[in-house]
């Protein structure tokens, strides 16, 4: 499935036309390649239009997008930041906050709704996305 041009434009604008990890210091590779969209919920074989909505997409450089699916440590790091979410979770993936460089947010289409850091981290621990202080 292909993300619509309108949704792509909305997500890029919401994320300031930069990789969501561009301003974050982390031990993984720096940004590389053109911008692309990262589905926060894996679509699996064949995909589904249900996951092609702005609240389930973030902007990533091609390098980080590739690492998110090919490097287990980086995938765990992304999970702890809400950038990768389990498709099999019993919780609505839209409720999972995302950690940007300037704080936690819940994504609502073209809007980032601020979430208190303590509340976001407690929620992430509850769903098993944060273990052993993985969020950096």
What kind of feature is each model-predicted range?
Residues 1-7, 40-47:
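Short Cys/His-rich Zn2+-coordinating modules
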Residues 6, 73-77, 122:
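Exposed alpha-helical structural elements
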Residues 10, 14, 77, 81, ...:
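Residues that form generic nucleotide/phosphate-binding pockets
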């Amino acid at each position: 499935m292909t993300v619509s041009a309108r949704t792509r434009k909305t997500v890029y604008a919401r994320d300031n036309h930069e990789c969501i990890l561009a301003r974050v210091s982390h031990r993984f590779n720096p940004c590389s390649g053109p911008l692309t969209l990262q589905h926060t919920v894996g679509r699996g074989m064949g995909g589904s239009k249900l996951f092609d909505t702005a609240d389930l997409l973030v902007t990533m450089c091609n390098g980080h997008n590739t690492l998110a699916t090919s490097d287990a440590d980086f995938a765990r790091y992304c999970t702890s930041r809400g950038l990768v979410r389990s498709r099999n979770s019993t919780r609505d993936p839209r409720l999972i906050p995302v950690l940007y460089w300037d704080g936690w947010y819940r994504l609502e289409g073209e809007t980032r709704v601020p979430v208190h850091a303590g509340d976001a981290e407690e929620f992430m621990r509850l769903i098993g996305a944060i273990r052993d202080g993985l969020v950096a």
